[in-house]
Amino acid sequence: MRVLHIANFYGDKSGGIRTTIHNLGHSYIQRGHEFTFIVPGTGFYCEETPTGRMIHLPSIILPFSGGYRIIRRNKDVRNLITTLKPDVIEISDRFTLSQIGPWAKKRNIPAVVFSHETLSGLVKTHLKLSLTRFVNWHNRR
């Protein structure tokens, strides 16, 4: 089976999403499946890893996030899906990649979303941090 996992917010500092993807990839490969994961990067490039093929897509840094990136164009993701022809798609972001599920459904590609966060948790963590940074910046001017 060809499994494709797509995630924004994957990077050197990410913990849960990165760990989840690596554990999934390791398990799929042990069971004889092909595992590819698409993540944000500084450009387009591929690399083979012990946990599967990692494809980086051009991305932008999300302001006030501590360096997290999001894939710049979902069209690039859709084009890769068409090229890779996965049997199933796993999505690790229900916000910025939300259009991928309905798009895949129209093409009869099963898709599932992994929710690593709650909206209230995101607001509590990131909005508070962003506001604090903004206020501190403003006060230093």
Outline where the language-model segments fall.
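N-terminal subdomain of nucleotide-sugar transferases
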Residues: 1-56, 82
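A short, flexible beta-alpha/helix-coil linker loop
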Residues: 9-12, 60-62, 120
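Glycine-rich phosphate-binding loop signature in dinucleotide/nucleotide-binding domains
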Residues: 80-87
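A short beta-to-alpha transition loop/helix N-cap that caps and shapes the active-site region
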Residues: 46, 120-124
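Membrane-proximal helix-turn-helix segments that form the acceptor-binding/catalytic region
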Residues: 106, 119, 133-141
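An aromatic- and histidine-rich active-site surface loop
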Residues: 89-121
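Short amphipathic alpha-helical segments
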Residues: 49, 101-104, 126
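A short, charged, and often flexible helix/loop element on the N-terminal side
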Residues: 52-79, 127-133
